[in-house]
Design a protein with these regions (language model features):
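Conserved acidic/glycine
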Residues: 1-90, 131-132, 142-145, 152-153, ...
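Cofactor-binding active-site loop characterized by glycine-rich and histidine/acidic residues
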Residues: 56, 63, 67, 72-267, ...
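Glycine/charged-rich beta-loop-alpha catalytic/anionic-binding loops adjacent to active sites
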Residues: 71-77, 148-153, 186-201, 224-230, ...
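Thiamine diphosphate
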Residues: 88-92, 195-415, 499, 517-518, 584-585, 646-825, ...
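Phosphate/diphosphate-binding glycine-rich loops and adjacent basic-rich segments that engage nucleotide
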Residues: 597-684
Length: 825
């Protein structure tokens, strides 16, 4: 733990100089004749053919995008195509030494990397493995198309696998159901797990943190292989990339992780440096590093073993990969490569290239890597022109056949959302219950019964009231934070892949003491602190989960959701459906909703998460519900945003008779719970507002003789309206409440649906009682911002049913609603 590494003022204040090592730039200088000792003729020709395959594939896409045809085959592809002509040597050189168990992640411009890694995997895998992969992947849909089309050609298994790879990738780009992910991923999200090709990403730099999670998965779960993160030079302007590099370079891997876990992450950050972002020139205009490799010196003391290499020479790239893979296998990662290359095409086919000169493009084209490699082999008499002509013809035939098959609507249909109206709906969630993601013992430090927190909890009362009905004191009652702890600790013992991390998760016990006691039970590699890097926390969780593990990560405050916006809104919720259900996403994100800490630490942003399809969202308010819902979340395979309120971490269980069970149990998502029965008015509450709603119910009953039924939503997505409908049928009136600002809140979504579903039973419009549309004020002023018990009576009186002789203290009239909206508050 950190206190084993005391920080002494005499050490940190002493005068010295920070030293940097020289960073190699294009130091490879071997001639092809010299390299012929390491490669056979077949090796050289395979490198050439793989480069040609990428070039022809990308040229074909450009032709289809600009002319709607290729080699006489007509097709219109309205989707995106970010092409990589010119970058072939970089992709093929990188993939040459990578094994199928090594994983690559890419960007929106990664067709070439997909083909290079796939072709390399095909070369290395045996025929039986390839046959099994093709026949079983998505029930063999893509395989049947290419197998039938090539039945008369007597192809070997490896040759057929090449046809399968090119066709499957193209069918995916063309949004066909026979594509690698039924056309739901498309050009910018294509991948193929059996060959070690992990998701590419349409969000620039998106792989920068996701790939780190994949590397964590390999390290923590002792899986062989390395991870390569392919990003462009433009991505170096993005925060998540820097956060990912920081997370990948944490000192604790080498200082605090123990045993075989000690050592750096097996990840290589490869910058496909084609000199441009979209149109901005990174060197000389939009960035200040001059050489992208320079940034490694700012990340860790090893300077990330950074090197700038000639990506126009496939042998130079292979040489660099050989050296860097050795570094990674020695547990000295991460590694950074600045791979110099160039794209001949624009950012996309519609790019007018107004930001660069034709002379610049011509200069690069004259040094074309494919043509230069061919000439070198001929000059060194390592191959003949006829060899290249045969390779070229084979490549053109493969690409042409792929176009013919992928363009044919009979052979390659699109997903029919007319006849299969629920096809995408079924893919949004996997809805599996998987107690452990892998069946093996869990790494733990002690037996559960020896844990001091477990022993302390055993002495607590698990119900909030004693036999006489008196409240149990807070220091003796089983609290909401204890319920969360029990569910989490149990899962650590049960699922060996589970990791938990975030800010102050270890030693501190979590910012709000939920994790207190875990440090004693869980080894460092399964529970650790991260930098203050919310994007990397969530992004790495995505990568860890899609690799096969389960993650429990934490954002200290809901207000920090914005710091991980892309990762929560674009990455976490979408990959299950974009993969056609192949990927699972067992990630639980704990999000604490604050109070007392003002405008940037006290916001309820549940609506941001409920708005995004693909996320499950829960918000328990009692110890019983917290434990049961957390258990359900950790047993599932879907991403869950698990909101918790800081107001109520210390509450005891007031509703479940008998208290919170010591054994494990689940509460199904989507089922609201009646916390108080009533007959005149329904209150549907979200989160901690439950307790103020219950106070209001007491006031209604005591002062006005109105019987109130209080329902705790518990879960927001999914949500079963049946219990609410039954209540409204009885009461005819309902208030929906929560601590979020009212405008745009999930409360208004609930109210809209209740208005539709209960129209015939409602005696008055549905009332929504949220917080004011202001900044959250100081604690001393919060009673004027968050819903208070008296407000329920005020809004009931002015919007639902007047109470004789009552005068509202807060205005909720229609006039007031119009006034506030005119002002935008």
């Amino acid at each position: 733990m950190p206190k084993d590494m005391p920080i002494q003022p005499s050490d940190v204040r002493k005068a010295e100089w920070i030293k940097f090592n020289k960073i190699p730039v294009c130091q490879y200088d071997k001639q092809i004749e010299e390299e012929s000792k390491l490669y056979t003729k077949d090796d050289f020709l395979r490198i050439y053919k793989h480069m040609r395959m990428i070039r022809e594939f990308e040229t074909m896409l450009l032709s289809i995008k600009t002319t709607n045809a290729y080699k006489g085959l007509e097709y219109n592809n309205p989707g995106p195509a970010h092409l990589s002509m010119g970058q072939e040597a970089s992709a093929v050189g990188q993939a040459y030494l990578l094994s199928p168990e090594d994983r690559i992640f890419g960007s929106h411009r990664s067709h070439g990397e997909i083909l290079a890694k796939g072709l390399s995997a095909i070369h290395q895998l045996d025929d039986a493995s390839l046959q099994t992969i093709m026949e079983t992947f998505l029930d063999g849909r893509a395989y049947r198309v290419v197998e039938q089309a090539n039945r008369d050609r007597n192809l070997t298994v490896k040759q057929l696998a090449v046809e399968f790879l090119v066709y499957g990738a193209l069918a995916e780009i063309f949004a066909k159901e026979t594509g690698f992910h039924k056309g739901l991923g498309g050009s910018m999200h294509a991948f193929f797990l059996p060959f070690g090709i992990y998701p590419n990403n349409a969000i620039v730099g998106g792989s920068g943190s996701i790939s780190v999670g994949a590397a964590l998965y390999k390290k923590i779960n002792r899986k062989p292989g390395v991870v390569v993160c392919n990003i462009g030079d433009g991505a170096l302007g993005r925060g998540p990339v820097w956060e990912g590099m920081g997370l990948a370079s944490m000192d604790q891997y080498k200082t605090l992780w123990e045993g075989d876990m000690k050592g750096g992450l097996p990840i290589l950050f490869n910058i496909m440096n084609n000199q441009y972002a979209m149109g901005g020139q990174t060197r000389g205009e939009t960035m200040g590093y001059d050489f992208a490799a320079r940034i490694g010196a700012g990340v860790n003391a090893d300077q990330m073993h950074a090197e700038r290499i000639d990506g126009y020479n496939p042998l130079a790239v292979i040489d660099a990969m050989k050296r860097k893979l050795k570094v990674l296998r020695e547990k000295k990662g991460p590694v950074l490569l600045d791979t110099i290359t160039y794209r001949y095409s624009g950012h996309s086919p519609s790019d007018a290239d107004s930001y660069r000169t034709s002379e610049e493009k011509t200069a690069w084209e004259k040094e074309d890597s494919i043509e230069a490699f061919r000439k070198q082999l001929i000059k060194a008499k390592l191959a003949k022109q006829a060899d290249f002509e045969a390779a070229d013809a084979d490549v053109v035939r493969t690409v042409t056949d792929a176009v013919r098959l992928a363009a044919d609507p009979a052979l390659s249909p699109r997903m029919c959302l007319t006849s299969q109206t629920d096809a995408v709906e079924k893919l949004m969630f996997s809805n599996e219950r998987r107690l452990k993601m892998e069946d093996r013992p869990s790494d733990m430090l002690q037996k559960r019964e020896d844990n001091p927190r477990v022993q302390q909890i055993a002495r607590k009362e698990r119900f909030a009231f004693d036999a006489a009905g008196k409240p149990v004191s807070k220091n003796k009652v089983f609290q909401l934070r204890d319920g969360l702890f029990e569910a989490i600790l149990a899962k650590f013992y049960e699922d060996p892949t589970l990791v938990a991390y975030g800010e102050e998760n270890r030693d501190w016990g979590g910012a709000f003491a939920v994790y207190r006691g875990l440090t004693e039970a869980v080894p460092y590699h399964r529970l650790f602190n991260t930098p203050i890097s919310e994007a990397a926390i969530i992004g790495s969780a995505v990568g860890y989960a899609m690799s096969g593990g389960r993650v429990l990560c934490e954002l200290m405050y809901a207000d920090f959701l914005g710091c991980a916006g892309d990762e929560i809104f674009n990455q976490l919720p979408k990959w299950q459906a974009m993969s056609a259900g192949i990927l699972k996403m067992p990630v639980v994100v704990r999000v604490s909703v604050g109070s007392k800490y003002g405008a940037q630490h006290s916001q309820d942003w549940t609506a941001l998460c409920t708005h995004v399809p693909g996320l499950k969202v829960v918000f328990p308010a009692t110890p019983y519900d917290a434990k049961g819902l957390m258990t359900t979340a950790l047993n599932g395979t879907d991403p869950v945003i698990f909101f918790e309120s800081q107001r109520i971490y210390d509450v005891g269980e007031q509703f479940h008779k008998g208290g919170v069970p010591a054994e494990s149990y689940e509460i199904p998502f989507g089922e609201p719970d009646v916390k108080r029965a009533g007959k005149d008015l329904t209150i549907l509450s979200i989160g901690a507002t439950l307790y103020r709603a219950l106070e209001a119910a007491e006031l209604f009953e005591k002062e006005h003789g109105i019987s109130v039924e209080v329902i705790d939503a518990r879960s927001l997505v999914p949500f079963n309206y049946e219990a609410v409908m039954a209540s409204v049928k009885k009461t005819g009136k309902i208030i929906v409440t929560g601590d979020a600002c009212e405008r745009g809140s999930y409360m208004t979504e609930l109210a809209r649906n209740i208005s539709d579903l209960c129209f015939d039973d409602l005696d008055a419009p549905v009332a929504v009682l949220g917080s004011r549309n202001w900044i959250t004020p100081a604690f001393e002023l919060e009673e004027h911002f968050f819903p208070q018990p008296e407000w329920f009576i005020d809004i009931f009186h002015e919007r639902i049913q007047p109470i004789s002789g009552y005068v509202a203290k807060k205005p909720f009239t229609s006039v007031e609603t119009v006034r506030r909206n005119k002002l935008g508050v």
